[in-house]
């Protein structure tokens, strides 16, 4: 039996920031900004010991933040299954994006989970985190 709730959940309509550290700020920014096309929204230096770059589309309810802290080693992704998944319903736009990534020197890698290879292409950023460009709509 399901329950119908008329009240809006507290997180509905909120903005999501995915934040993580990096030891390779400019290489990571190049991957996401110049490769994947996320515009640079802002950059900060020595904010309580942190430097960072925030990427995203103006007005979008999500953005990416990359930070570095003096004296802190961020290291690489803990597994090959740390993913951002981008669902791209337009097949031509998806093909163009794959071409842009190739021209920027980013080569596809086999996905740890073979599900993502069936309708998508996976790229690994300089820190070992992965982005899946999935060709299709999100089914939910």
Feature annotation, model-predicted:
Residues 59-64, 127-131:
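Short, charged/polar, Gly/Pro-enriched secondary-structure boundary elements
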Residues 46-47, 69-70, 90-91, 114-116:
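Short beta->alpha connector loops
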Residues 12, 20-63:
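Core segments of cupin and vicinal oxygen chelate
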Residues 4-7, 70-74:
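Short beta-strand/turn micro-motifs at beta-sheet edges
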Residues 1-11, 14-23, 43, 53-58, 74-140:
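Vicinal oxygen chelate
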């Amino acid at each position: 039996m399901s329950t119908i709730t008329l009240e809006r959940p507290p997180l509905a309509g909120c903005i999501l920031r995915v934040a993580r550290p990096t030891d390779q700020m400019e290489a990571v920014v190049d991957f996401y900004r110049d490769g994947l096309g996320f515009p640079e929204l802002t950059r900060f230096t020595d904010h309580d010991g942190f430097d960072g770059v925030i990427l995203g589309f103006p007005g979008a309810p999500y953005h990416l933040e990359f930070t570095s802290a003096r004296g802190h080693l961020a290291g690489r992704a803990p597994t090959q299954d740390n993913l951002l998944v981008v669902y791209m319903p337009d097949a031509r736009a998806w093909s163009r994006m794959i071409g842009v990534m190739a021209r920027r020197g980013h080569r596809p890698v086999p996905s740890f989970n073979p599900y993502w290879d069936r309708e998508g292409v996976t790229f690994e950023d300089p820190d070992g985190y992965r982005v899946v460009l999935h060709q299709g709509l999100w089914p939910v």
